[in-house]
C-alpha cells in the first residue's frame, strides 16, 4: 500500500480530522488508546489507520462515499473512523444496537457504499441489501487469553460472520489520495431522534476539530498536565460528545482515550486506582450510576482533575454529591456542566474549574457567540429569557437532504453572521454565564438521547387496534421515562393483548430509551379547548 508522496511528505492534510492525529504521531510516541488493559501507541494507531484505509480503498471507497459504522467504542472502530476520514469518505456513525429495519432506511437515505458492524451483530444485519457488509471486531486488540476465548465465548453471536472481517481484505496496490479539504462534508450524525426517520446532521472536519482546539482554554493552567493523561472514552461515537470530546480531543492534545465498549464500573475503578485517568466525561444517567457504585469513593480519585457533564438536564443533587465525594478524598476535581448540540458537534459552552457558577452551563468558547432572541427574532438583554442562538466555527453544514429544515434552523443575520437556532430557552446573566430554562422544541431527553413523542405516536397509530395515542415524558429525577396512553378502536378489544402488541412493535423499531415504560389503555384522551390532546392532564394521570 502507498499514499500520495506529496501529501504524506508535506502533511498537506494536517487540518483534517485524521491529519491532526497523523501529524501528532510524528512528534509523540506515547499511549493513544487503552482498551481492556492493553495500551496502543500513536505509532500503532497510525499504522492501523493506514492499513484500514488501504483495505477500504481496495473495496472501492473513495472521496465523498458514505461508510456507515455501527459498532461500540473499540479500537477497530477508531481505526475505521479515522481511515474513512483519511481518504475523504464520509463517516456515518450510528447506534451499534440500531434495529435492522431502521438501519436499512438510514443506509438508503445516505446512499451508503459500505456498512461496518460489530462481528457479534452480523447475523442481525446480514440480510440488508443496500450495500456490502463487513465486520470489525475487538479480537485483534485483546490480550492473548481473551483473544483465544473470544470465538468460543461469542460462538452463537458470531455465527455466519466468518469471511466478512474487514481485516481479511487485501491491501490496495493503488496509491491512496489523502483528503486535504477540511470544509467538505465528512461526518453524518443523527440529530438524536428515536428512529431512523430523524434528521441527519452534516459536519465537516473544521467542526469536529474545534473542541480539541479549545482544550487548553477549558483546562487553563492545568493544561500542562494534559500530555499523556487519560480521558475516559466510553460515550459512543454516534454521539457528538463521545466522538469529539471522548475520542478525538484527547488525541489532538497528546493525551490518551480510554475506550470502553459498554459502561463497566469495575474497569473504570481499575483505571482510577491505577491513576491513569485524569478526565471524565459523562451524561447524567451515567453520573448517577457512578455515584451509586463504589468507583468514585476511593482515595485514588485524587488523581482526577476534571469531570464534564452534558447532553441532558442534570439534577443539582448530582453536582453536590459528586463534589462532596471528591472533597472527601482530597481531589480537586469537580463536576462541570457544559452545553452544546449535534448541530455544533457537541459542547461550545462550559463551566471551568476556575470560572464557574452553580446552575449555569458556563461561558462560551472564545470564538463562540451567543445571543438570546424573542419570538420575533429581536435580541434580548441580559437576564431576559428567550431562544438561545449560537454562532461558532463548528456549526453544522445543515441537514442531509432537508433544505427546509436547514434554512429554518441555520440563519444568517444582516451582518453575515451564521447562527443556529437551538430551540432551547434560556438567558445570559451579567457575568456572561448561560442558564438553560427548558426546551422550546417538542422533544425531551432520556439518558442523553433526544426522544421525539411524534415518532412514538406515529408508529403506534399504525398498529392494529389503536385509534389514537399520546406519548408523554415523566420527569422523574431518579428515573425519567415515557408513558404512552392509547385509545383503542374497539370497546371489545383485549387490552392486555393490545399493550403487548404495541410494546413488541415499538421495541423492534425504537431505541430502548424511547420505548414507553408504561402503556395505558384509556377510554378517552383528554382534549384542550382547541381540540388538541391535553398532555398536561395525561402527565397528571401517571
Regions found by a protein language model. Give the residues of each.
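Conserved AMP-binding/adenylate-forming
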Residues: 35-38, 53-98, 230, 234-236, ...
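Gly/Ser/Thr-rich phosphate-binding loop
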Residues: 278-281, 291-357, 369
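Conserved ATP/PPi-binding loop(s) of AMP-dependent carboxylate-activating enzymes
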Residues: 363-367, 378-410, 449-451
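AMP-binding/adenylate-forming catalytic core of the ANL superfamily
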Residues: 77, 98, 105-106, 115, ...
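AMP-binding/adenylate-forming catalytic domain of the ANL superfamily
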Residues: 508-532
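Conserved AMP-binding/adenylation subdomain of ANL enzymes
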Residues: 209-230, 238-279, 293-294
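Conserved pre-ATP/AMP-binding loop-to-beta segment of ANL
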Residues: 153-190, 197, 222-230
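Conserved AMP-binding A3 loop
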Residues: 41-43, 177-180, 186-213
Amino acid at each position: 500500500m502507498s499514499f500520495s508522496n506529496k501529501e504524506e511528505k508535506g502533511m498537506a492534510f494536517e487540518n483534517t480530522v485524521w491529519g491532526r492525529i497523523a501529524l501528532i504521531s510524528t512528534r509523540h510516541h506515547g499511549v493513544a488508546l487503552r482498551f481492556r488493559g492493553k495500551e496502543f501507541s500513536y505509532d500503532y494507531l497510525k499504522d492501523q489507520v493506514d492499513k484500514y484505509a488501504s483495505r477500504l480503498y481496495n473495496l472501492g471507497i473513495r472521496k465523498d462515499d458514505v461508510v456507515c459504522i455501527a459498532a461500540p467504542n473499540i479500537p477497530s472502530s477508531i481505526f475505521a473512523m479515522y481511515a474513512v476520514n483519511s481518504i475523504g469518505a464520509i463517516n456515518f456513525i450510528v447506534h451499534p444496537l440500531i434495529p435492522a429495519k431502521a438501519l436499512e432506511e438510514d443506509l438508503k437515505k445516505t446512499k451508503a457504499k459500505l456498512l461496518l458492524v460489530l462481528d457479534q451483530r452480523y447475523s442481525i444485519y446480514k440480510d440488508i441489501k443496500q450495500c456490502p457488509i463487513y465486520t470489525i471486531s475487538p479480537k485483534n486488540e485483546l490480550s492473548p487469553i481473551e483473544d483465544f476465548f473470544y470465538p468460543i465465548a461469542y460462538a452463537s453471536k458470531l455465527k455466519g460472520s466468518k469471511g466478512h472481517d474487514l481485516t481479511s481484505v487485501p491491501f490496495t496496490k493503488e496509491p491512496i489520495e489523502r483528503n486535504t479539504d477540511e470544509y467538505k462534508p465528512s461526518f453524518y450524525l443523527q440529530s438524536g431522534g428515536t428512529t431512523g426517520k430523524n434528521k441527519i446532521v452534516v459536519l465537516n472536519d473544521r467542526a469536529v476539530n474545534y473542541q480539541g482546539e479549545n482544550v487548553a482554554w477549558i483546562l487553563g493552567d492545568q493544561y500542562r498536565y494534559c500530555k499523556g493523561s487519560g480521558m475516559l472514552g466510553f460515550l459512543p461515537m454516534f454521539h457528538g460528545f463521545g466522538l469529539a470530546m471522548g475520542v478525538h480531543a484527547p488525541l489532538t492534545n497528546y493525551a490518551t482515550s480510554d475506550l470502553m465498549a459498554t459502561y463497566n464500573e469495575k474497569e473504570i475503578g481499575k483505571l482510577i486506582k491505577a491513576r491513569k485517568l485524569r478526565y471524565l466525561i459523562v451524561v447524567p444517567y451515567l453520573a448517577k450510576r457512578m455515584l451509586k457504585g463504589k468507583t468514585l469513593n476511593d482515595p485514588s480519585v485524587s488523581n482526577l482533575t476534571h469531570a464534564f457533564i452534558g447532553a441532558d438536564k442534570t439534577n443539582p443533587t448530582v453536582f453536590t454529591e459528586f463534589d462532596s465525594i471528591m472533597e472527601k478524598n482530597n481531589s480537586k476535581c469537580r463536576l462541570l456542566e457544559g452545553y452544546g448540540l449535534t448541530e455544533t458537534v457537541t459542547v461550545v459552552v462550559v463551566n471551568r474549574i476556575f470560572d464557574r457558577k452553580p446552575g449555569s452551563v458556563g461561558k462560551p468558547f472564545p470564538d463562540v457567540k451567543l445571543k438570546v432572541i424573542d419570538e420575533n427574532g429581536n435580541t434580548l438583554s441580559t437576564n431576559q429569557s428567550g431562544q438561545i442562538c449560537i454562532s461558532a466555527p463548528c456549526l453544522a453544514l445543515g441537514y442531509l437532504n432537508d433544505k427546509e429544515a436547514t434554512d429554518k434552523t441555520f440563519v444568517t443575520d444582516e451582518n453575515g453572521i451564521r447562527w443556529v437556532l437551538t430551540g432551547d430557552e434560556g438567558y445570559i446573566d451579567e457575568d456572561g454565564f448561560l442558564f438553560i430554562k427548558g426546551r422550546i422544541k417538542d422533544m425531551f431527553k432520556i439518558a442523553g438521547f433526544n426522544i421525539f413523542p411524534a415518532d412514538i405516536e406515529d408508529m403506534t397509530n399504525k398498529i392494529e387496534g389503536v385509534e389514537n395515542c399520546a406519548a408523554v415524558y415523566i420527569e422523574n429525577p431518579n428515573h425519567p421515562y415515557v408513558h404512552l396512553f392509547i385509545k383503542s378502536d374497539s370497546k371489545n378489544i383485549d387490552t392486555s393483548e393490545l399493550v403487548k402488541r404495541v410494546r413488541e412493535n415499538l421495541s423492534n423499531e425504537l431505541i430502548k430509551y424511547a420505548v414507553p415504560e408504561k402503556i395505558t389503555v384509556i377510554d378517552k384522551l383528554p382534549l384542550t379547548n382547541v381540540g388538541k390532546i391535553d398532555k398536561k392532564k395525561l402527565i397528571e394521570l401517571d
